[in-house]
Amino acid sequence: MTAPQTDDVVTGRIAAIWAGLLDRPEIGIDDNVFRLGASSVMAVRAAARIREALDTPLPLRDVFESPSPAALAKRIRASRSTAPTASGPPRTAPVDSTATAPLTFQQEPMWLFDRMQPGNATYTIHFALRHEGHLDLGVLDRCVRDVVRRHAVLRTVFPSVDDRPAQQVLDRAHIPLGESDLRALPEAERPVAAARIAAREAQAPFDLSTGPMLRVRVLHLSDTRQRLLLTMPHIVTDAWSDDILVRELNHLYRAHTDGIAPALPPLPVQYHDWAARQRAELAGTEAELLDWWRHHLAGVPPLLELPADRPRAAVKRHRGGRLLFDIPESVTRRLEGLAKDEGTTPYAVLLAGFAALLHRLTGQDDLLVGSPVAGRTHTETEGLVGLFVNTVAVRCDVAGRPSFLELVRRTRRTVVESFARQELPFHRLVEELAPVRSPAYTPLVQVMLALQNTPDRDGREPGEGPFAREESGGDTGSAMFDLTLFVTGSASGMRGEWEYDSDLFDRERVAELGPQLVTLLDAALDRTDLPVALLPLQEPAARDRMVQAWNDTADVLPGGPDADSLPALLSAQAHRTPDAVALRTDDGAELTYRQLHLRADRLARRLLSYGLAPESVVAVACERSFEMVVALLAVLKAGCAYLPIDPGDPAERTAYLLRDSGARVLLTLHRHTANLPDADGTTVVTLDEPDPSGDMQDTTSALPGIAPGQLAYLIYTSGSTGRPKGVLNEHGPVCNRIRWGMRAFPPGPGTIVLQKTPIHFDVSVWEMFWTLATGATLVLARPDGHRDPQYLAGRLVEEGVTDVHFVPSMLAAFLDVGALPEGHSLRRVFCSGEALSPGLRDRLFARLPHVELHNLYGPTEAAIEVTHWRCRPGEPTVPIGRPIANARCYVLDAELNPVPPGVPGELWLGGVPVARGYHGRADLTAERFLPDPYGPAGSRMYRSGDLARWRRDGVLEYLGREDGQVKLRGQRLELGEIEATLAGHAEVADVVVDVRGTGPQDRRLVAYVRPARPGRDEQLRTTLRELAAARLPAYMRPSSYVTLDRVPLTPSGKTDRKALPDPAAGEQPRSGRGAAPGTPAERELAGIWAELLGAGEVGGDDNFFEIGGHSLLAARMTGRASTAFGVDLPVSLAFEHPVLRDFALAVVTAQAATDSAATERLLAELEALADTELEALPDEDGPDGRSGE
């Protein structure tokens, strides 16, 4: 250690000041004070003392950036050479205490908050002191009066003068000494009673306009034990001030009881004097400080999304709680050691650990953490009670997978830079950077870290005497921020205390944070080179509970080993109930189990006659019919895999599916052949035409056995690259789902299931085969009937349906058409395909109180569904539940580590249900299907792309998607596939597709297009509509096209979807085409369409589906039209006549058919049409505007 150089007075004085603050005899001039244990509070005090001792200006940043006496002296000499006349800060001038003074910048937001939420205890400071022995209440009362007399701020009130807040010092303030005697209570009850009184004291409001500003209450716990409760509004105090009060109370009490005069040093200024000086000082530096902060915080996210137990309310109520935890001495010692090694403060290391925890909890890598700083940048304020504390917003950068040591170094730099500019009041920063604020959360900062190392908390009590601080004086029942971590030193390490928003977080969740922080810090300090992303958050037992106990689903399901293929499972039931009705159609036709299997066996043998090998792909393009079910079952019995195709899809898409899958045979109906493409190499079999082989067909040979690992079906889903991708599902996983359903939902007497899901969606698999494996009857909805909620309601009643599946958006439309009659047969409703909202769930229970509602989840890549939850009314959320039999679910971070309960992560699916992979896409299969590190050897898991979280009870909650995949009216689609299709047109320079709309029935696809050439917007929209109609299925076609000059980007260069304009601000769904509506019916319908579609004007030639309509809106539209015209209109009418003029004529025709009095209206409607319009009326059904369910 080099002794201070006596010939360098500046260096010597700086070294002496630091030695005093560090409680050392001396320090070397080249010593890094932060390696010697200096804290940020010490740096502020050192700056104030050096300014005064050397009579020189000294920016706080210089102290942080020049951490040795020699380096700081060199910087001071350099600044003097460039500004030789500069001198230190002037003393604060006393002001007239009888006049009103302005508030300080720190007080202004507190005063405003009190005005906005009077009685809210958020900004109340409350702490407790313990006392042992005899307490002289008279002496204590005298001490309190002395303190109030000494510190004018405790005699200050805050009136409004000319509509502006002000502070006014009173000559005197009476502070009554409250008492609560608990000695009469049993000793075991006293702590509870004391806590109740402390909470009441902490939560009682203050009247800032009249005072008093201090409450003191003594709790008598025994004859020799007392607790002193002190409560003040934050507008007059801070943590530093609290220690001053404790120190002075101790000094005064000791002096008065000893009969000697108190020796407290006189105060050079009072708080209201400082208020005037603060504004004058800031006036000269504010612009420079604002410039720095504006640049430093550019692009910072406005909200830190901590995992919460409840959704954030529209208006923050600041209700809260507090919870203590310990940071062990072994962790504290290593934390302080790392700080010294890195030449930084323990606060910087603790903040790095806290930022790492927040990063792991939220997935965000750009974090803003608030830190309270003392704000006492002048020595004359060190002994003054008052609100000086300021909040500094520290930006923590966790991007790029840093090690913990790298994160500490990053944090040290930003702490130094930010603390060096702490003079700017936080609320001025808020006014500048967040002028428009949400009432739901605090601006800029929602999380705070407060290392409470005020001068009297550096390992010492705040003044020797009879009163000692207790760890927590009482819960105010409020919280300033979403989450605050207070940390103080303790005899066994550090003591942490969480203050949390109880509207967001359960106490149990917050209780998990302390152990998680300690576990993370312990590992990080043991291996500082370890990436933050790999640091553990949980003890092994907690981790094992999630990946093992909550996935303990191994089970032997009904049917035994002979039920591991669909043909075996279904044939066994046919043998048990051969004469039971298996299928029933809309017109009452029926097939028994015997008839169904005879037909399927005959077709299976016909397929085998084409030389098909096991797992050959056979395409099935059929509307709902007997032939459709027979075809599917026959393909399976032949040992082949079926490829379902929507016969209404564009021919180009169908051709791609046939070509990509290598389908050898296409099974269809004659009426579909005109819409099918030429399929080279594919044999087309029309099922409703005679078999050319006639009586020559083999009817006796045995059909092949099917292994569980054999391919059952190939279903194509939307692909992000612009190409659909085929998912390969085997018999074993599918049978696992069917057999689990047989046990979970056993059929009762007369079980009847409505089959309404198109076969190219995998829900149809269990809809059909669960029914046919249990002996129940499958009622086939008419083709396109699944889009018509009124029709479906009728079928449920007429057929006595007991079980039905809905995607949530269609369930909402179904509930809109009215209740089922008394005595209806419906027992169970199944939901999947979209998130089920609590509101929709409760609507169903209100309408159908005795019906079971089951929420299921699963992608096509995991055999239909892998989780299940039976819903109950009134719960705050609708979970997706727990894994079904033999399924495993993991919620993992980007490193494939399990995340703690409550923390969002990506949902990975394992166990028996996992599909084989993607057909012909080995690269994508390797990317999405990985070895399962938590399952049995050789098992795999599937990356779903869904965000989820575990509840603490082992139940899963779905949180949405992390990529461009969306679910729209139950249809899974990749926005990238739509974008790629549209971007392929030469006139498109850039395109973004997004989902817009509020409720589930209003959501629609909108394409935002930047044209390659300006001035051709309308022509381009028409061209893109035609392109989408030719290449995309109806459910993937955008309803609206909005042209943009440029696509908005985030600061990181990604598409900013939140900044995309509402369709109404760009292009309303195209409308107003052709002549204006001319007949009364057209005008009535045009108004209905315009209201539903948000269109400005609707023309007579507008197509409902081209101007923004979809199947659910069609259901609402026909419902309104039915009411308006007094006639029941099926939803199919909108698909058959999607043009307004045609639809209007169809409506009045329907009226005429049901009401003879409407005949005249029909004639009037026809007469109102011009001859040319009559000639233009279609002879056949209008264009197909079909959409998915």
From Swiss-Prot:
Known cofactor(s): pantetheine 4'-phosphate
A Gene Ontology biological process annotation?
A: secondary metabolite biosynthetic process
**Skewed-composition ranges (Basic and acidic residues):** 455-472
Q: Which UniProt keywords apply?
A: Antibiotic biosynthesis, Ligase, Phosphopantetheine, Phosphoprotein, Repeat
Cross-referenced PROSITE patterns = AMP_BINDING (PS00455), CARRIER (PS50075), PHOSPHOPANTETHEINE (PS00012)
Domain Carrier, residue spans: 5-80, 1076-1151
Q: What class of enzyme is it?
A: ligase
Q: Where is this region: Condensation?
A: 100-541
Pathway connected to this protein: Secondary metabolite biosynthesis; bialaphos biosynthesis
Q: Which GO terms describe its cellular component?
A: cytosol
SUPFAM superfamilies under this entry? Acetyl-CoA synthetase-like, ACP-like, CoA-dependent acyltransferases
Q: Which Gene3D superfamilies match?
A: 3.30.300.30, 3.40.50.980, ACP-like, Chloramphenicol acetyltransferase-like domain, Luciferase, Domain 3, Nonribosomal peptide synthetase, condensation domain
User: Adenylation: where is this region?
Assistant: 572-969
Task: Enumerate the GO terms in the molecular function aspect.
Answer: ligase activity; phosphopantetheine binding
List residues modified as O-(pantetheine 4'-phosphoryl)serine. Answer: S40, S1111
* Catalyzed chemical reaction(s): holo-[peptidyl-carrier protein] + L-alanine + ATP = L-alanyl-[peptidyl-carrier protein] + AMP + diphosphate
- Chain intervals for the UniProt region annotation (Disordered): 75-97, 454-476, 1045-1081
What the entry lists under SMART domains is as follows: PKS_PP
**Source species, domain of life:** Bacteria
Quote the entry's note on domains.
Modular protein that contains a first peptidyl carrier protein domain which bears a phosphopantetheinyl arm to attach the activated amino acid, a condensation domain, an adenylation domain which activates the alanine residue into an aminoacyl-AMP ester and a second peptidyl carrier protein domain.
Q: Which family does it belong to?
A: Belongs to the NRP synthetase family.
Biological function: Involved in the biosynthesis of phosphinothricin tripeptide (PTT), also known as bialaphos (BA), a natural-product antibiotic and potent herbicide. Adenylates L-alanine and loads it onto a peptidyl carrier domain via a thioester linkage to the phosphopanthetheine moiety. Shows weaker activity with aminobutyric acid and L-serine.
Q: Can you name this protein?
A: Phosphinothricin tripeptide synthetase PhsB
Q: State the species of origin.
A: Streptomyces viridochromogenes (strain DSM 40736 / JCM 4977 / BCRC 1201 / Tue 494)
